[in-house]
Amino acid sequence: MARYDVARLDELEGTVKKLRRALGVSAFGVNYFDLPPGAEGLEHNETQTNQEEVYVYVKGSGRLRCGSEEIEVGEGIVVRVDPEVTRQPVAGDEGLQWVAIGAPKDGRYQPPSWG
């Protein structure tokens, strides 16, 4: 029998809403981020996990630092980032909300302990 799961963002706590865990996803990572106005997210890359990521911006505006470049992001913008690129989100005056989806390029996803 086919199965589905539903999560409500307003019932998930924190700046990082752990959708993968809430929905029981096992093949890829997926989280919802809600950065308050002017906040900076974690600067990181995905070299250790070899994880390619896609960010779908759904509300607010801001910038995504990718290596030495900055990309203006906001509602309706979608960005893909290679694993080795260092990235850091920065929320604008309205805050910034996005969905992050990721999976390793070799296809062997291992859920992180934090998410």
Question: What annotation goes with each model-predicted range?
Answer:
Residues 1-29, 36-37, 110-115:
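A short, N-terminal "cap"/entry segment at the start of jelly-roll beta-barrel domains
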Residues 10, 88-115:
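Double-stranded beta-helix
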Residues 20-22, 42-48, 90-91, 111:
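Short histidine-centered beta-strand/loop micro-motifs
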Residues 32-35, 47-64:
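Short, conserved beta-strand element in jelly-roll/cupin
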Residues 39, 54, 61-63, 70, ...:
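Structural motif
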Residues 43, 64-65, 81, 87-93:
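Short beta-strand His + acidic residue motifs that chelate non-heme Fe in jelly-roll/DSBH
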Residues 68-84:
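Short acidic-glycine-tyrosine-enriched beta hairpin
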